[in-house]
UniProtKB/Swiss-Prot annotation:
Catalyzes the GTP-dependent ribosomal translocation step during translation elongation. During this step, the ribosome changes from the pre-translocational (PRE) to the post-translocational (POST) state as the newly formed A-site-bound peptidyl-tRNA and P-site-bound deacylated tRNA move to the P and E sites, respectively. Catalyzes the coordinated movement of the two tRNA molecules, the mRNA and conformational changes in the ribosome. Pfam families: EFG_C, EFG_III, EFG_IV, GTP_EFTU, GTP_EFTU_D2. Belongs to the TRAFAC class translation factor GTPase superfamily. Classic translation factor GTPase family. EF-G/EF-2 subfamily. The modification Phosphoserine is found at residues 213, 302, 569, 680. This is Elongation factor G. Gene3D superfamilies: 3.30.230.10, 3.30.70.240, Elongation Factor G (Translational Gtpase), domain 3 (3.30.70.870), P-loop containing nucleotide triphosphate hydrolases (3.40.50.300), Translation factors (2.40.30.10). InterPro entries: EFG_II, EFG_III, EFG_III/V, EFG_IV, EFG_V, EFG_V-like, EFTu-like_2, G_TR_CS. It comes from Bacillus subtilis (strain 168). GO terms for cellular component: cytoplasm. Residues 8-282 form the tr-type G domain. One of its GO terms (biological process) is ribosome disassembly. The keyword Chaperone does not apply. GO terms for molecular function: GTP binding; GTPase activity; translation elongation factor activity. Its main location: cytoplasm.
Length: 692
């Protein structure tokens, strides 16, 4: 099968935005106008084409980026719908990695919102060219020029309007195209017919003013145009378009469009702008990779002639075809039924079938070409971020980096039948999502799941129930405390049972001392003259090790202590290993009153990134969580606060930070060291654990 669309006529785009800016509705309309959907689905009725997981329809938010193929004016447009919620930023990063360009959707009433900042920063990191669509122009309080202003003020983006709305709120009737210098009025409800007319008299002056500032901004990025402009020559429409395209592709300029996806106005013009201003795979720099054997850097150009290379950016379990691996082809071609090498894992994989996805239906294709996005069926070992390549010409494309999970919750199956299913379900979910981890706590035997936030874990538990039919109880998050001794002492442990017949006799003297942090348990045998026979020494050590596991204060493991066995006595008949084991554990219990045992807690290294104006609130909040601020620095237009905070105080922090900063703050944390718990807090924990 020959290539249907040339590389120059291919666009891989993402649609990114804050929650509820109208991203899914915009995607819907794009699919409607490109002829892939017959009936328009409304998100607020829970019937959208792109949001196809049940919980997405219920919550009205988009979680998985469904990759969809559409056609417009002889071009192929691959669209990746991305989530706009903080807990799902990994999905966004994942999509941005494989896109060539993006449409940022703003709400005309609010302009740039908190999550827009986060997603915008991520897009800048990956160097993704963007056009901006100011949506919801029909909403009360909609203000187009205010929204354009927020792009400049809050994101320092060189953004300029290339359109102007005619009217606003209920009177939003049409759109003025500042590049072509015409006005579009919509004739029917579905917005399929719009006629280009002359700009209405009352808008002429404003339109001319905005068009002139647009031309100036474009000329500043292009010397030839600047010279022409300064000499007073007219800039033609084609030159203006070429200038906007050049600035956009260099990520130096952001054209801003306007409309209302819900009212079917302006979406076709967004599609035209995608073709006019966003890059084809050939406009993007060649992707860099390394040879697995020599680590030498190599490039793969976007061409069918080059060896095959692709990046897997999403793994999903589909109820009908099993495991689907979404991938972006960077170079070469791939036929279904052929073999490829997963160079990241060093495994050979067979591509059973190749599907091109349309929101929730699929079409089987025989070949994918450079620049395409498709899903493969039949890959066994491939996970998110892996490179797939030609077996004869290996390359590892730079992978994606995923943040560490920040929240842990204990989970247990409701019944025995759920137990086995739960293990399988968790393993499959962890395979799909690199920011979700699962482990079994060896001390409590609980299954612990970890993720990026409370909503993230809620949805995981919800998916277990719906997709895998597993019912589970979710506990409150737990902290792994430890215990240790602060002072040393010599203690006796004596176990004697002699009441006729064979008795029990074990007697030891042990000196306990605190050990260095992280050094663990050390046992020393200092018996002289056989007062405790050699064969009983290992029993003394084993008795201590068992007793340490259960602690002395609140049942948490006792760590970092030294024990020296220096004296004791035995009985010819009644002594045995068991008796010495018990004697050793009694010695440890007797040490409680003399060795000043304390409780230790994990201390997390926390880094919070926030806009300057929230600095005071955040510092106060960290202090109230028993945290110590270690340092601060400016990073771009944000502030970074570094602090040490006990894990026990960090539960619910993601939610608190979100509300303290209107969602504009982000944080990362990882375990740093153990530290003594303050007395008042320790007493509470001990009481709770002893069930008092």
């Amino acid at each position: 099968m020959a290539r249907e669309f040339s590389l120059e006529k291919t666009r891989n785009i993402g649609i990114m935005a804050h929650i509820d800016a109208g991203k899914t509705t915009t995607t819907e309309r794009i699919l409607f106008y490109t002829g892939r959907i017959h009936k328009i689905g409304e998100t607020h009725e829970g019937a959208s084409q792109m949001d196809w997981m049940e919980q997405e329809q219920e919550r009205g938010i988009t979680i998985t980026s469904a990759a969809t193929t559409a056609q417009w004016k002889g071009y192929r447009v691959n669209i990746i719908d991305t989530p706009g919620h903080v807990d799902f930023t990994v999905e966004v990063e994942r999509s941005l990695r494989v896109l060539d360009g993006a449409v940022a959707v703003l709400d005309a009433q609010s302009g740039v919102e908190p999550q827009t900042e986060t997603v915008w920063r991520q897009a800048t990191t990956y160097g993704v060219p963007r056009i901006v669509f100011v949506n919801k122009m029909d909403k009360i309080g909609a203000d187009f020029l205010y929204s354009v202003g927020t792009l400049r003020d809050r994101l320092q983006a060189n953004a300029h309007a290339i359109q102007l709305p005619i009217g606003a709120e209920d009177n939003f009737e049409g759109i003025i195209d500042l590049v072509e210098n015409v006005a579009y009025f919509y004739e029917d409800d579905l917005g399929t017919r719009s006629d280009a007319k002359e700009i209405p008299e009352e808008y002429k002056e404003q339109a001319e003013e905005l068009r002139n500032s647009l031309i100036e901004a474009v000329c500043e990025l292009d010397e030839e145009l600047m010279d022409k402009y300064l000499e007073g020559e007219e800039i033609t429409i084609d030159e203006l378009k070429a200038g906007i395209r050049k600035g956009t592709l260099n990520v130096e300029f952001y054209p801003v469009l306007v409309g209302s996806a819900f009212k079917n106005k302006g979406v076709q013009l967004v599609l035209d702008a995608v073709l006019d201003y966003l890059p084809a795979p050939t406009d993007v720099a060649a992707i860099k990779g390394t040879r697995p054997d020599t680590n030498e850097e190599i490039e793969r150009h976007s061409s069918d002639e080059e060896p095959f290379s692709a990046l897997a950016f999403k793994v999903m379990t589909d109820p009908y075809v099993g495991k689907l691996t979404f991938f972006r082809v960077y170079s070469g071609t791939l036929d279904s039924g052929s073999y490829v090498k997963n160079s990241t894992k060093g495994k050979r994989e067979r591509v059973g079938r190749i599907l091109q996805m349309h929101a929730n239906s699929r079409e089987e294709i025989s070949t994918v070409y450079a620049g395409d996005i498709a899903a493969a069926v039949g890959l066994k070992d491939t996970t998110t971020g892996d490179t797939l390549c030609d077996e004869k010409d290996l390359v590892i494309l730079e992978s994606m980096e995923f943040p560490e999970p920040v929240i842990d919750v204990a989970i247990e199956p409701k019944s025995k039948a759920d137990q086995d299913k739960m293990g399988i379900a968790l393993a499959k979910l962890a395979e799909e999502d690199p920011t979700f981890r699962t482990q079994t706590n060896p001390e409590t035997g609980q299954t612990i799941i970890s993720g990026m936030g409370e909503l993230h874990l809620d949805i995981i538990v919800d998916r277990m129930k719906r997709e895998f039919k597993v019912e589970a109880n979710v506990g409150a998050p737990q902290v792994a405390y430890r215990e240790t001794f602060r002072t040393g002492a010599k203690v006796e442990g004596k176990f004697v049972r002699q009441s006729g017949g064979r008795g029990q006799f074990g007697h030891v003297w042990i000196e306990f001392e605190p050990n260095e942090e992280g050094a663990g348990f050390e046992f020393e045998n200092a018996i002289v003259g056989g007062v405790v026979p050699r064969e009983y020494i290992p029993a003394v050590q084993a008795g201590l090790e068992d007793a340490l596991e259960n602690g002395v204060l609140a049942g948490f493991p006792l760590i970092d202590i030294k024990a020296k066995l220096f004296d004791g006595s035995y009985h010819d008949v009644d002594s045995n290993e068991m008796a010495f084991k018990v004697a050793a554990s009694m010695a440890l219990k007797n040490a409680v009153s003399k060795c000043n045992p304390v409780l230790l807690e994990p201390i997390m290294k926390v880094e919070v990134v926030i806009p300057e104006e929230y600095m005071g609130d955040i510092m106060g909040d960290i202090t109230s969580r028993r945290g110590r601020v270690e340092g601060m620095e400016a990073r771009g237009n944000a502030q970074v606060v570094r602090a040490m905070v006990p894990l026990a105080e960090m539960f619910g922090y993601a939610t608190a930070l979100r509300s303290n900063t209107q969602g504009r703050g982000t944080f990362t944390m990882h375990m740093d060291h153990y530290e003594e718990v303050p007395k008042s807090v320790a007493e509470e924990i001990i009481k709770k654990n002893k069930g008092e």
